[in-house]
Amino acid sequence: GRRVDPAALSGSLVITPTANPLGLDNRTKTAPQDLQDLDQTFPGNPQGMVTNHMAHALFQEVRAVASCLVNMHTMGSIHDSKPYCVYKVFPGSAVTEAQLLRMTSFFEPSVSCRMDVGGAGELPGNIA
């Protein structure tokens, strides 16, 4: 596998092995407590149900230290598939598509899917 050279970093690197432990433990995409998909609840809501609480807490922690988030996915009934990435391209962003792809390539995704997001409901910034 690839290794990160701390001397080559020009920022912070935060790695969370799993963002959705409730779904992982249940072997589903959704949390059994509220049947919500964590990926679809970002940035979360501290007044919402348990999945919204998790999304809010995680998003606030990452947002405080990151200019870009690499969000890898897997799927399959036992989460045994190859990782993939959906990357978001925002109009006027300081982070280029080439930079996003370079960041995701470190994780060797089986596929990277581009998503143009300029709608009013999307958060500003880059999420890969």
Language model: regions and residue ranges:
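Structured catalytic-domain cores with a bias toward divalent-metal coordination
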Residues: 1-128
